[in-house]
Amino acid sequence: MSTGFSFGSGTLGSTTVAAGGTSTGGVFSFGTGASSNPSVGLNFGNLGSTSTPATTSAPSSGFGTGLFGSKPATGFTLGGTNTGIATTITTGLTLGTPATTSAATTGFSLGFNKPAASATPFALPITSTSASGLTLSSALTSTPAASTGFTLNNLGGTTATTTTASTGLSLGGALAGLGGSLFQSTNTGTSGLGQNALGLTLGTTAATSTAGNEGLGGIDFSSSSDKKSDKTGTRPEDSKALKDENLPPVICQDVENLQKFVKEQKQVQEEISRMSSKAMLKVQEDIKALKQLLSLAANGIQRNTLNIDKLKIETAQELKNAEIALRTQKTPPGLQHEYAAPADYFRILVQQFEVQLQQYRQQIEELENHLATQANNSHITPQDLSMAMQKIYQTFVALAAQLQSIHENVKVLKEQYLGYRKMFLGDAVDVFETRRAEAKKWQNTPRVTTGPTPFSTMPNAAAVAMAATLTQQQQPATGPQPSLGVSFGTPFGSGIGTGLQSSGLGSSNLGGFGTSSGFGCSTTGASTFGFGTTNKPSGSLSAGFGSSSTSGFNFSNPGITASAGLTFGVSNPASAGFGTGGQLLQLKKPPAGNKRGKR
């Protein structure tokens, strides 16, 4: 019986305890041998062992006597080989102990084990182990192993498929050895934070489930009827056609939202049509008045600018004259005959006086004429008016003649400029033609008409829908007609109530959504919005999700029949994805049948 603090006391062949003897380790022991009696106290190395057959003949204590000794290792050992077939319980913290065929390892163990007769330190074996506790072992098994606690498994080995249920906190999952493939087919279900290959798993196992592929509207393709084919023996009547199935609630919600949006837009249009244009006209008048005031202010600012410039020039001239007078005063009288600056000053001053006198004379004459007219009290006669109009006409003729001469000069300069560009720059392009074309384009653009009812040209929605329905009845059928709601096998025409083709979603005169650019406008020769617009035999293009003769917006194989599964416009003659469909097959009218026996 060992008491106190012992380090690696032997159990087999020692003097104190015989092989398989009865011994109890008390207090604190490190690396004691396994016995049939329970151990008391705190020990590292006999954590859960049951029995030890005496098959070896030498004790190992502590850290062992060598790395390559031929002794069984109990306790904390590094190295050690086996001389025969042993059934040993690996206890404690072991590195490189012999491998066991059926053992229960408990406690904290780092068991890099190999089979007997070939064990080397830090080997990577394949064992059938049921590990519990805190273990960092290499337990790649070919049989199902239930590991609990904290395990770091699969650090080597060359076996393949395993079926492991890992619970607790485990580092690593079922992985083939370094010599095997990294992507073996395992059946391990993990949950929480986990990876199957050398990862970290937190939590318990969960059943593996595959996410279904969902299409438009949240429909699972795996449960769809398009997987059924005639080759598997299923009957055609087992699968439902798309027109007989209810639409997904997501698409129904989208259609309801679209109808609600159209209704709101119609209400806004009605409110705009009921508004009066007096407020807009008043705003226009205010803008005109403000423009006049702005022009007056601009003219005043321009006049003041000119006056300021004139005053600057006059001030500079007066400073110059003052300097001339100062120098003239300082010049002696005998030398002033050579100084001509005063003479120039007086000459310019006389010219200014002359101009001012002429202006005064003209103003005096105008004033005398006005006073004479007021004294005579004579009114303007028709002859005077005709004479004034003739003078104004002659003035306009003279101005037109001057404008014509200027225009001819500009044309000559234009030809010279174009010739210069062609000769020196080698550019024969008429640069004035592009400007002329742009000006013409701006002139030809229609102006925005303002008024109380901008949507007055909109036709009645019910009448348009009825006309569209009658037109479609007269045309040869291009596919199955919708039975309820909106069918994606046929275009978006007359499928909902009064129809979405020519009314509501953008008729040819609807200004709110743009001219000829609605969701299904019936304009001839114009391809508008659509997920695969279809060509009807009448020549009108309507937008839809593809009719039964085109493959505009499909989610499945175009080669299958159009009545099987969830197909969006699927048919045999497949056309481009989001483009306009090709020319449809023109079906002839059916021959006149035998009317015998019919009423």
UniProtKB/Swiss-Prot annotation:
Keywords of the record: Coiled coil, Glycoprotein, Membrane, mRNA transport, Nuclear pore complex, Nucleus, Phosphoprotein, Protein transport, Repeat, Translocation, Transport
List of residues that carry Phosphothreonine: T331
Signal sequence interval, chain numbering: none
Gene Ontology CC: nuclear envelope; nuclear membrane; nuclear pore
Post-translational modification: O-glycosylated.
InterPro entries: NUP58/p45/49
GO biological-process terms attached to the record: mRNA transport; nucleocytoplasmic transport; protein transport; regulation of protein import into nucleus
Residue numbers spanned by region Disordered: 213-247, 579-599
Compartments where located: Nucleus, Nuclear pore complex; Nucleus membrane
GO molecular function: identical protein binding; nuclear localization sequence binding; protein-containing complex binding; structural constituent of nuclear pore
Coiled-coil region list: 256-276, 314-381
Region (14 X 2 AA repeats of F-G): 7-579
Main location: nucleus
Record has Cytoplasm as a keyword: no
Record function comment: Component of the nuclear pore complex, a complex required for the trafficking across the nuclear membrane.
More about this protein: In rat, the p62 complex contains two different isoforms of NUP58. Isoform p45 has however not been isolated in human so far.
Listed PANTHER family: NUCLEOPORIN P58/P45 NUCLEOPORIN-LIKE PROTEIN 1, NUCLEOPORIN P58_P45
Protein name: Nucleoporin p58/p45
Gene name of the encoded protein: NUP58
